[in-house]
């Protein structure tokens, strides 16, 4: 499953959507099959943990890749690289000389709701570990809230901190010299949280993950 750095990079690739008008829309999820975004303008695209958000006027499209989801970008009319039956959202955006299509394939989660519900919808999530202004103290409080829980399970819990997945959990525990099954109460949670943040921050713009070596030595783990 993609982790927070992958979703951040995806969001960065989709920034071209901002300011473009939707010229065609198909939501292939039964609950939202009648939703039409045509004529709306994409206000912004952003990540939160492993979740991706797109705002069109006062409507938010909220998706999660889960295990197999992807977003494809191509010119309208071009042949898709994946089968049509895997598409969950098809967005056509204004562009000259040819419109652009953005297609979400095999998305594991799709919700569409009014923009004023955004904070309510993400209230269950912990602080986003890749937010430049992330709330470290709140994440630490949540991490310490269940002292008998295994540290590995706690780091994976998106209600504790949003964005960490299995690969970064394993690497953070390894770099901290801690077995993932160790109870939270027996771990220097501030240190392991800081390691998690640092290795993810170091990889936030890189297509190839590196968790040891020169790059990380520059951030003083």
Each language-model region and where it sits:
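Structured catalytic/nucleic-acid-binding cores of DNA maintenance enzymes
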Residues: 1-219
